[in-house]
C-alpha cells in the first residue's frame, strides 16, 4: 500500500472520528440533562418586631451565626411594664367590684319577698354578670400587656446567619417593619434552570452532581421537584381583555427553561454555601 493511499484513508478516518465526536458533543450538549445556570438558595426569615419601641440592647453582629432561641435584641421594656402594672390594677379593681356585687346579690336572695321585689333581685343578678364581664375584660387586657412585654425580647426563630444588619442601639423599631433577616442554616437547596427539551431525562429522586463556581467543589444531591409552570412571554392581556399574541419567526424556536429543585445530600464542613451564588448541575451522575 502506497504512502498516498495511507494518507488518504488516514484523512478519512480522522474526518469520520471528528464528525462522530462533534455529533456526540452536540447531542450531549442538546440532550443531556445538565446546566450551568444553577443557583444556591436558602430560606430567609424576616426578623420583625411585634411591638414598637427604642432598641436598648443588640446582641448580634452582621453575618453572625445564631442558634434558635438566642436573644437577638431587646426593646425598651419601660412602657410595657407600666402597661402591665396598670392592667394588674384594673383587674384587681374589677375583681373587687365583682366580690361586692356577689355579696349584694347574696344578701338580697336571703331577704324576704316582703322586703325586696323580684325586679330588685334581677337587677342585683345582672350587676353580678356585668362585673364578671369586667373581670374577663381586665384579664384579657392583662394577658395582652404581658404578651407585649414578652415581645420586647426578640429571639431567633431558627438557627442561621444574620444578614443585612444595619440596626443599631438607639434605633426605633416599628411594629411589623422588618429589621433584618436570618438565613436558615438548615434550608439550603439548589435551583437549576433546564431547557424543556431536557426534562424527559429528569425524574424526581434522580442523583445529581452539583459543582460550585465559588471554589469548584462538587456536591452530591438529588432532584427534589420539577416546576409545573413558567411565564408565557408570547401572550399578554390588554385593557380589552383580548390576548395580545406576539409575532415570532417560524423557523426559530428557543427552548423555554424550567426550574428544577435539588436537595443536597450532604454538605462537607469545609464547604461554604452562599445563597444566590452560581453552580453547574449534571443530573444522573
Curated annotation (Swiss-Prot):
Keywords (A to Z) from UniProt: Membrane, Transmembrane, Transmembrane helix
Transmembrane segments: 6-26
Gene Ontology BP, a term: response to toxic substance
One Pfam family from the record: HlyD_D23
Gene3D superfamilies cross-referenced by the UniProt entry: 2.40.30.170, 2.40.50.100, Helix hairpin bin
Name of the protein described by the UniProt record: Uncharacterized protein YdhJ
Keyword Metal-binding part of the UniProt annotation: no
InterPro entries: CusB-like_dom_1 (IPR043602), CusB_D23 (IPR032317), MFP_Efflux_Pump (IPR050393), RND_pump_MFP (IPR006143)
GO molecular function: transmembrane transporter activity
Record's GO cellular component terms: membrane
Localization in the cell: Membrane
